[in-house]
Amino acid sequence: MQEIVIPLKEKSYKVFLGELPEIKLKQKALIISDSIVSGLHLSYLLERLKALEVRVCVIESGEKYKNFHSLERILNNAFEMQLNRHSLMIALGGGVISDMVGFASSIYFRGIDFINIPTTLLAQVDASVGGKTGINTPYGKNLIGSFHQPKAVYIDLSFLKTLEKREFQAGVAEIIKMAVCFDKNLVERLETKDLKDCLEEVVFQSVNIKAQVVVQDEKERNIRAGLNYGHTFGHAIEKETDYERFLHGEAIAIGMCMANDLALSLGMLTLKEYERIENLLKKFDLIFHYKIIDLQKFYERLFLDKKSENKTIKFILPKGIGAFEATSHIPKETILKVLEKWH
């Protein structure tokens, strides 16, 4: 089993990559999963979990259930189980479950521990590591949340065997995001290798990138913003389509394409670099047709992004391959001209 240590000022923890080991706990544990994952993997976890008391809370599957109602269900289960400050929650699922359980554990009794056991590629390489938690609101995605680091993360690649191809590819989008902004060697590996032949190495490399970024910038003041490449546009797309048409990773892939268009227009990408990223997305079937219905309304949605400040939109744009730049004060006319391609 491989380990990555994430040493933070207030709390350090480990990410374990390998077969899920026996987890022995001396306290109560509330497992939260969704209606699909629980049917596939809950028994596998229960076979390996030893705790003072175990209870399971199952939430409906899907991004549209990442809301106040689901959060309340998790907290009600915790109260009914009489969890205390020494108890913990366990997130078994994808990014939606990871985000919600992290947030629920951060506000229950002003904060208790939680463990992440991600079952999707997207959650394994991104959502489960770093402590960003939250829920969606009618106004936008992840607008209510907190920074709350897990006690541990267990990444078992055998969970991925039950993923549909579409879900798997959505996770690859997040790997490409990290590669383009932080690691040109990973870009080259994705371009030249068959991912099936090097999946464990790529997952480890991606988690390691995320870990290093989080250690440098836990609360997203500077370098961690690079992990939001594609997300300003992507979140607007998810909201506009009511979280139903695209998976999160798919929306981010479209968002990266829009960000690339903007970067190209600003001279931050050469045409060759632009085409490299586009071809990489094509390789993993991550090029999608999307039509913006109302250009002005879509533009206004961009201001609801958490990175926006002083009435300006902050974009994370690739600066060549392996680097990025956070940029604001781009004229509205420039943004709308780029988005015309999608209108």
From Swiss-Prot:
Q: Where does Zn(2+) bind?
A: E174, H231, H248
Location in the cell: Cytoplasm
CDD domains, per this entry? Answer: DHQS
**Which cofactors?**
Co(2+); Zn(2+); NAD(+)
Which InterPro entries does the annotation name? Dehydroquinate_synthase (IPR050071), DHQ_synth_AroB (IPR016037), DHQ_synth_fam (IPR030963), DHQS/DOIS_N (IPR030960), DHQS_C (IPR056179)
Query: Which reaction(s) does the protein catalyse, per the Swiss-Prot or TrEMBL entry?
Result: 7-phospho-2-dehydro-3-deoxy-D-arabino-heptonate = 3-dehydroquinate + phosphate
Q: Name one GO biological process term.
A: amino acid biosynthetic process
Name the Enzyme Commission number(s) assigned to this protein: 4.2.3.4
Pfam family name, one: DHQ_synthase
Residues engaged in binding NAD(+): 61-66, 95-99, 119-120, 132, 141, 159-162
Name a GO CC annotation attached to this entry.
cytoplasm
An example of a GO molecular function for this protein is: nucleotide binding
| Protein keywords | Amino-acid biosynthesis, Aromatic amino acid biosynthesis, Cobalt, Cytoplasm, Lyase, Metal-binding, NAD, Nucleotide-binding, Zinc
Asked if the Swiss-Prot or TrEMBL record annotates the protein with the keyword Nucleotide-binding, the reply is: yes
Which leading EC class covers this enzyme? lyase
What note does UniProt attach to the cofactor annotation? Binds 1 divalent metal cation per subunit. Can use either Co(2+) or Zn(2+).
**Involved pathway(s):** Metabolic intermediate biosynthesis; chorismate biosynthesis; chorismate from D-erythrose 4-phosphate and phosphoenolpyruvate: step 2/7
What is the role of this chain? Catalyzes the conversion of 3-deoxy-D-arabino-heptulosonate 7-phosphate (DAHP) to dehydroquinate (DHQ).
Give the family, as the similarity comment puts it. Belongs to the sugar phosphate cyclases superfamily. Dehydroquinate synthase family.
NCBIfam families noted in UniProt: aroB (TIGR01357)
Name the UniProt record assigns to this protein: 3-dehydroquinate synthase
The record lists the organism as Helicobacter pylori (strain G27)
**Chain's gene name:** aroB
